[in-house]
Amino acid sequence: MFCRILSHCATFLVIARMASAVADPVVQAQELRDSWPQWRGPQRDGIHRGKSWPESLTPDSLNLLWQVTFGPSYSGPVIVGDRVFTTETKDKKYEVVHALDRKTGQEIWQTSWEGSMNVPFFAAANGSWIRSTPAVDGDRIYVAGMRDVLMCLRTEDGKQLWRFDFVKEFGTPLPAFGFVCSPLVDGDYVYVQAGASLVCLNKMTGAVVWRTLKDNGGMEDSAFSSPILATIGGKRQLLVQGRQKLSGVDPMTGEVLWSQFVPNYRGMNILTPVVWNDSVFTSSYQNKSWLYRISHDNQQFGVAEVWRNNAQGYMSTPVLIDDHVYLFLQNQRFTCIDLKTGERTWTSGNFGKYCSLIGQGDKILALDQRGILLLLRANPKQFELISSVKVSDEETWAHLAVCDDEVYIRGLNTLKVFRWTDPKAQP
């Protein structure tokens, strides 16, 4: 591993943990607004709780602040305090983490290690570069490398604090498509779907706390999804989607509380599940969408299918707004599903191959894989495209990020940062 420090500057915002009972609610709210520290934002739900968005999206409303060129990556950018973190695969050999100045894009440090790998030939068109979105927690950043390696680096200077090689430690096969899961940090622990299992590590030392949901890994079983934390049936739990099943797991002990097989095509259960009340929504490639109700009675959990419909999700995780999920489908269309009934209230026309989604109020910001940013109305009655603008000449598979009034676009080889304003409000 190589670590190159370019400067030492800035004081880091310490992210309040969602589970803390003593956190200052005012400070915590400010930190939630001012950061995008992990996969799909502060609460891993794809919802932006910061400044209200403008009513339209036009070239005049997006001001390019800076852009930087890198090697290819599918990792979403993460933003904490005055720093931005992004990854790249370099020279088909190294994986690199960059820390950038949020105002200028100037590099502060970079850390690299040998670790790239080739995905199977039939998926080569999808690229063999780093995929997982890092997670920042206080003065540490957790980064997953393709060869089933989890790195813990110091955010100040990129120094490696610990490294966990799941293949070496567990004797499991390499995940055929690389380490895809994005780390989840909560309390004293970091959780990942890696090493042909769900693993809880001590976030300070990298020591294994527990391991569960073991599978065969490799081509057939290595996870594509990322875990979230939710309270379901009165019990706080990890919600974990593997290639074959959906499970609830006790975050402290690793006990599997419940599991539900999710019908799938070749294990293509990819998106991050969505929690609604005591139910869980998921959707599977070339299959269907489901809502499962999780019950908890006399210390026993039960799972019941509430409904299913023919909406076929793929890689895009939906956003939940007012009892409806807005989902981008395998067939490259948007759809809206009423969670109470399972009814698909509308389906749009065609767009790109993939869209990442962020919601706020009655609006959805969607980054189309063709480099087009879309502003949609979260209208359950009809599809409503408010406006759109071209933001990249490259493909944009990495997840969109929004922090304050800034929009972060990670193209295949470029990171762009825009300030999104209302031109009518300018003096």
Predicted regions and their residues:
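Sec-dependent N-terminal signal peptides of Gram-negative exported proteins
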Residues: 2-23
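Aromatic (tryptophan-biased) beta-strands that constitute blades/sheets of beta-rich domains
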Residues: 24-69, 95-122, 159-172, 208-216, ...
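Conserved blade-register residue in beta-propeller folds
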Residues: 97-99, 152, 200, 248, ...
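Extracytoplasmic beta-rich repeat domains
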Residues: 67-78, 94, 110-135, 163-185, ...
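Loop/turn-rich, solvent-exposed surfaces of beta-rich toroidal or solenoidal domains
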Residues: 288, 309-378
